Regions:
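Conserved alpha-helical scaffold segments that buttress catalytic/binding sites
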Residues: 1-306
């Protein structure tokens, strides 16, 4: 694992996830569309950690978002060091790092990186199904390939649909014009993906999305920062108006925790170079905090708040 200037939210650093309940991994790069070129979100893990540098000094403070105190048993295992000239090797290293966390009995929380990161992340759950993917994103992400690349950031949900251990999918926050063509929308719906648009969430809240999750399901949560409105998180590569609000996503996470078990979580597509104020990183980092708390209190979750 790579070294860190600071850990996420002041959680202790550890190279070994054994004994932890939740283990964070930074993943700057996975699969670029331009060979040898680092991701537009490669700096995001460091930005997410830096956004909460003061948070580690306040573990005894009450957190009103999570309704309690920060969970115990959380460690930051640093970054998975990849090689942008060797995407297959990088994906294998990501999958191996996540598998190591799972084998240690901890829940992995991944700080991406772009939206190609969920593919090797999900791959680590082979043999651990059946799983439901709950995605927050402005885009469908069902492209089979882009310029011959099948593992890039337009394809994570397509690749997830091909993994036998993933049996359900709920996609929340879609809006506007993105990468999806008519064929991809048809394929997603034919496979059984439940699509909940951003407009539906604005009209009815996150209840309709939560209704698509089977009680007791084991869920992988993936949050693309562009799923939120650019007024909330402007630091993304693909801005689109009409996105989800911060508390939509918080309510979704805690709603999931009340009816399902969250077995893995990732956040991707923060673009630090479009975030000069650091507000996007702060907002995204707080979503990660809520994700950690939701993992901790979900049925069968590993830890409780302290």
């Amino acid at each position: 694992m790579g070294s860190m200037a600071t850990t996420f939210a002041g959680f202790p650093a550890s190279d070994d996830p054994r004994g932890a309940s939740i283990a964070l991994l930074g993943v700057p790069d996975a699969t670029p569309y331009t060979p040898g070129q680092s991701s537009h979100s490669a700096g995001a893990p460091a930005a997410l950690r830096a956004a909460l540098t003061g948070y580690g000094t306040m573990p005894e403070h009450y957190d009103f978002d999570i309704g309690g105190f920060r969970p115990s048993g959380v460690v930051d295992c640093g970054d998975v060091v990849g090689d942008v000239s060797d995407p297959p090797g990088t994906r294998a290293r990501i999958t191996a790092a996540v598998a190591r966390v799972l084998e240690a009995g901890a829940v992995p929380v991944v700080l991406g990186g772009d939206d190609s990161v969920p593919i090797p992340f999900f791959q680590a759950f082979v043999g651990r199904g059946p799983l439901t993917v709950v995605q927050v994103d402005a885009h469908l992400d069902w492209r089979d390939e882009v310029r011959g690349e099948r593992f890039g950031w337009s394809s994570p949900m397509r690749r997830a649909s091909e993994m036998p251990w993933i049996e359900r999918m709920v996609q929340v926050g879609l809006r506007g014009v993105g990468s999806a063509r008519a064929g991809e929308v048809t394929d997603a719906r034919s496979w059984g993906s439940a699509i909940v648009t951003a407009a539906e969430v604005h009209r009815a809240g996150v209840g309709p999305a939560l209704d698509r999750v089977v009680p007791g399901a084991r869920c992988l949560v993936t949050i693309d920062c562009d799923g939120l409105d650019p007024a909330i998180i402007p630091g993304v590569s693909a801005r689109a108006p009409g996105g989800l609000l911060y508390h939509h996503v918080v309510d979704l996470l805690h709603g999931l925790a009340a009816k399902a078990t969250i077995v893995g979580f990732d956040l991707v597509e923060l673009m630090p170079q479009r975030d000069p104020s650091g507000l996007s990183a702060l907002t995204a980092a707080r979503l990660v905090c809520n994700g950690i708390a939701a993992i901790a209190v979900s049925p069968g979750g590993p830890v409780r708040g302290t």
